[in-house]
């Protein structure tokens, strides 16, 4: 299911402007979401509210979010693709107005 997609723990120490970008092969339609969670390392199924960043429609090859202001706190970033059980390589880039305020680590499951 959806929550088996790659997830990353994101800790933000102070307010920042973020933009998320993913690139992959043109055969894979991708989406990126950043959801608030209560504690570092929680998976997206533990989200406390709606996503603060969502790239919306799945797009092939390259997806970029709008620049968004994000408050300090704990978040989970989830990279998903349109087709269930489809896997592939991707490059994720997180751009921040203050890179030292943002810490990212992969959630191993």
What spans do the regions from the language model cover?
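Intrinsically disordered, low-complexity terminal tails and linkers
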Residues: 1-109
């Amino acid at each position: 299911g959806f929550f088996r997609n790659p997830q990353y723990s994101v800790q933000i120490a102070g307010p920042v402007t973020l933009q998320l970008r993913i690139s992959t092969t043109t055969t894979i339609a991708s989406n990126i979401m950043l959801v608030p969670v209560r504690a570092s390392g929680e998976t997206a199924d533990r989200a406390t509210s709606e996503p603060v960043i969502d790239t919306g429609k799945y797009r092939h090859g390259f997806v970029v979010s709008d620049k968004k202001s994000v408050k300090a706190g704990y978040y989970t970033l989830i990279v998903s693709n349109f087709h269930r059980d489809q896997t592939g390589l991707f490059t994720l880039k997180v751009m921040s107005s203050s890179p030292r305020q943002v810490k990212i680590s992969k959630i191993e499951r």
